Amino acid sequence: MIVRGGIEPGSFRVSLTHLPRRPGNMWEADLEFVAPPELEVGMAKVAPASKMPAQIRIESVLDGVLVNLDFDFEVEAECARCLEPVMWTDHSRVTELFLYEETDSRGRVVQACDDASEELTFFYVQDDAVDLLDSVRDAIVLDLPLSPLCRPDCLGICPQCGDKLEGAPHEHAT
């Protein structure tokens, strides 16, 4: 069952039951997702179970629905130079076409066997809903930095003693 403005609690599935299948129809809403677990790249990760406010626009097109999703997410990381914790809010955008599955004259789903399309990945409308999890994961992974910095001019730590090089002069006896 899909509730709360078209979104299933605890998932990224959005119901399309309120959107007529006629091309040109549109549905817009403000939603809130919960960040999926274990979403990280290098030294940065999405804060586990954090709220992800989003604005969604779903447009009915001839072969499916076009989804435009803008969302914010909280990032937790360590500076790649000084290893201090760093947190910020990032923004991402997803635009994805979800196709309707082909059906026969009785409304049963037809399984297409096209060897040429094996390399392509399509997203499909399933049970009058779209699942945005894979698209959101892809967008976040592309947005997270591999080597986050607390500041662009961070000096890092001393390679000999491990102290931060910020602030007071730093010297070692030779």
Label every model-predicted segment:
Residues 1-174:
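Structured interface patches
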